[in-house]
Amino acid sequence: MPVITLPDGSQRSFDHAVSVMDIAMDIGPGLAKACIAGRVNGELVDAVDPIVDDASVAIITAKDEAGLEIIRHSCAHLLGHAIKQLWPDTKMAIGPVIDNGFYYDVDLDRTLTQEDIELLEKRMHQLAETNYDVIKKKVSWQEARDAFAARGENYKTTILDENISHDDRPGLYHHQEYVDMCRGPHVPNMRFCHHFKLQKISGAYWRGDSNNKMLQRIYGTAWADKKQLAAYLLRLEEAAKRDHRKIGKQLDLYHMQEEAPGMVFWHNDGWTIFRELEVFVRTKLKEYEYQEVKGPFMMDRVLWEKTGHWENYKEAMFTTSSENREYCIKPMNCPGHVQIFNQGLKSYRDLPLRMAEFGSCHRNEPSGALHGLMRVRGFTQDDAHIFCTEEQVRDEVNSCIKMVYDMYSTFGFEKIVVKLSTRPEKRIGSDDLWDRSEADLAAALKENGIPFEYQPGEGAFYGPKIEFTLHDCLDRAWQCGTVQLDFSLPGRLSASYVGESNERQVPVMIHRAILGSMERFIGILTEEYAGFFPTWLAPVQVVVMNITDGQSEYVAELTRKLQNAGIRAKADLRNEKIGFKIREHTLRRVPYMLVCGDKEVEAGKVAVRTRRGKDLGSIDVNEVIAKLQDEIRSRNLHQLEE
């Protein structure tokens, strides 16, 4: 006779085992109709799973995040159902949920085309619209293996053989004649799976191993209703317009080529943005009292063996050799910073020591994972490491957090999700040390009034960390900033300082990154601003144009005056119509266009236009220069008169 406690604290008693669906029906038919699954004592279960003992139960509907994830997972099964009907010889591999959707890896003889995807999506809709029930059956390991062996599903039998205990009872989900295996839960009926779209196909090795067979991965998105799906597809359309690869080409910022995969060729305008970012970061380094250093980009393999990188990270490291010595091109800056710290005797009076570098790093990312500026092999980190005592950790973390928010606000990022990752099972250091460290990180966040969520067990083996994830104008998440405590590396590399008691002690090391990779951050900014960089970042800030040859000398003189005032200005003296010039520079996203006709020359003024098409009228030259200087100096996100 289970007693069920609902989220509002109310209780309902039953004289027999019940399911989540039974409980929903007992509350009301509307809730039963909306019920997708349930959370029983904190665990997600199918709507039909029996509850025999007292339990806390929450009904999951499409309005819940978990409900949406279940819909997406069931759509992956629906994809399997449809593809087996269209191409019965298809072998099904895995079909998990991902951000905003799902995918399924399949093995079939034909190469799928866009026409095939459209046909597949049509069949999925036909099946879903019959609103069939999804039937769950728990079976023995052997029954599950026999079922998939009989169907020739060798990937499923491999999963059973290698990943599932013989004592387990796998869940088989029956979609009419199609059967799939999953821990669940799934929707009870396909009426919940009407709002989806297949998006693209790519290649994927079985289990991510290039030694295995290449499968075809079919991606899709799924939502709770038509409105959500339409809004998401609109966001995708907007994201395509903002694609930094497309804008980078339009604005001539950079290029990449096959001879240097994952390496950036910065063109003049793109490099101007890069250097302006460096200037900005340097002003903050000075403000927050960091030293700027520069380490070598290549060091002996022996050093990387000491740090543990060679054992755990060598697949991602580029190596070379000379004179019978093997060298590693650095994937990160921290070991080099410890070497700098180790030069000369350090006292507790020298701490905290804050060391920053624009470090040129390289990582051997898989070629299939490379993506414009967002995923590269060669990149520059705005990296810093703080050497301090245990007692100084809290204040230093506090300062790091202030610096993170100070810098992000300059770029207009307002939604920042913060997560605190705590001790994993395998770790170094005492529980007491972890207790204090985690408490210091949490206290620093609370002191700054920053809401955060814990990620239990997600910290590195050498210390807890804070992650800062930016959300852009399309609400896409970009994990950029980290503040990571490290109890391991300084000791591994023999870093020490003389403490107050005159004994050598190992410093705590704080890894701190804010922008992360400079290249990736420029990619993020390009998409955030759609190429309309704020004036302080814009490669060309002002173009001065003449209407006829009669104003050429005035334009040239004004351009020099702007340049001498520290403004990135260019003159356009081409023999083209003024409308053509304005249109061209507007497409180049130049913040300001200054037009000079005879009236402007006579009055010592310029006609000012913005790239958004706003006419600011005729303004005195010195006033324009002063206003532009102020906008650039303050790193204002908005243009004049906006």
From Swiss-Prot:
Q: Bound how, and how many: what does the cofactor note say?
A: Binds 1 zinc ion per subunit.
- Which branch of life, at top level? Bacteria
Which EC number applies?
6.1.1.3
Provide GO CC annotations from the record.
Answer: cytosol
Task: Kindly state which keywords UniProt assigns to this record, in alphabetical order.
Answer: Aminoacyl-tRNA synthetase, ATP-binding, Cytoplasm, Ligase, Metal-binding, Nucleotide-binding, Protein biosynthesis, RNA-binding, tRNA-binding, Zinc
Disulphide-bonded residues = none
Q: What is its main location?
A: cytoplasm
Q: Where is this region: Catalytic?
A: 243-534
Record has Zinc as a keyword: yes
What Pfam families does the database record attribute to this sequence? HGTP_anticodon (PF03129), TGS (PF02824), tRNA-synt_2b (PF00587), tRNA_SAD (PF07973)
- Which co-factor is required? Zn(2+)
Chain positions recorded as Zn(2+) binding sites = 334, 385, 511
The molecular function GO annotations come to: ATP binding; metal ion binding; threonine-tRNA ligase activity; tRNA binding
What's an example GO BP annotation here? threonyl-tRNA aminoacylation
Q: Self-association or partners: how does it assemble?
A: Homodimer.
Q: What does this protein do?
A: Catalyzes the attachment of threonine to tRNA(Thr) in a two-step reaction: L-threonine is first activated by ATP to form Thr-AMP and then transferred to the acceptor end of tRNA(Thr). Also edits incorrectly charged L-seryl-tRNA(Thr).
Q: Return the protein name.
A: Threonine--tRNA ligase
| Upper lineage | Bacteria, Pseudomonadati, Pseudomonadota, Gammaproteobacteria, Enterobacterales
Protein encoded by which gene: thrS
